[in-house]
Amino acid sequence: VSEATAVEVAATGINWNFSPCIAIPQDEKWGRHYEGYSEHVDIVSEMGEASIIGYQTTELGSVNHSIVACAKHFIADGATIWGTGMGNQSDKIDRGNAPISDSLIRAKYLPPYQRALDAGVGTVMASFNSINDLKCHANGYLFNDLLKGEMGFDGFVISDWQGIDEIPGDYKSDIVKSVNAGLDMIMVPGAVKGGGEHYKTFLQLFKESVDEGLILEERLDDAVRRILRVKFRSGLIDNPMTDRTLLEKAGSDEHKAIAREAVQKSLVLLKNDGILPLSNSKHYYVTGSGADDIGKQCGGWTIKWQGELGNITPGTSIIDGIEQYSTTNRNNENKKFDAAIVVVGEDPYTEMKGDSDQLYLSAKDKESIDEVKKMNIPYVVVLITGRPLIVNEIIDNSNAFLVAWLPGTEGGGVADILFGE
């Protein structure tokens, strides 16, 4: 998957991907829960390493290309506590505080980063959260002592999106604290404290800080050296232009097949009382908010920051995939059905917008299930979600229950499992 992703990204002219996220989510209420591979350190370590190798040493078919990977978010973003979220989200969890010991950091949250470094990851992104009430973006122990010193990381550290602005103090002190803490590249989009054009304000205050000795030139030289090192290693200096032949692979049938296989292998069947696999010769009533919605399948970070409902990008919806096998209520004029498939689940979200302590299906989704129950035919529930939800009663009442997670643009992979392919 990461090899194909590298080719797709490189084809656009972008040579750096802010991935993999090797967070270890501990609270399903967190709006970034789905960005982590697992709550188990060994799985996260293994998946993160594989992604980095795929991104940075890509060799897929006749294409030999790579992009720079970024392990994120350093560190313990999945360990924050509900009720410690940032600013006006203080009643939530995203960008909150992780009250954890150094020994727990080393035992649970550091191993995926060690595997990332062993795999040669080029960059690491700082985390929005705090550890014991100290913002990671200002925590020199994490980056100077632990990551660069003890672990020997010689790539560069980048801030998160406007991440230094959340450090207590004025904007100049944010710059000084973050750069001295070991951040080598700062993302400064949007407005900054005190207003003004963000990049001009940053450059002015950064230069002042160096001139005043608040940031030593040695620290600046180190940051520049690290950034150039990654550029040389990635081949960007010797070959800065995009290989346009990669466009032939972008959106190719080969890549779509890889995505579809990934969907097939990531689903979880929680219940089957014999209704699955479905039969090609029967007719199915397909309903629910997620039956024909690629945006819902993709979730957040798709086209827009928070994602968007609807068929917002080319792909195969779940009902499209089902109709590759059998007829549905979209083309069955007789209105006689042997069973029903109800596709329900979460609408797209990301970050603090997805923080929620109400991990239940919406009233609309429950109505769709109740509608099918009244038809007195067997039914399968397919759940689209970025995290576990409380659906015990729905599982009990259904004939089969399949968790599709966020299958992306290849909804046909869900249909493959329903029909036993």
Explain the meaning of each model-derived region:
Residues V1-E421:
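Glycoside hydrolase catalytic-domain context in secreted enzymes
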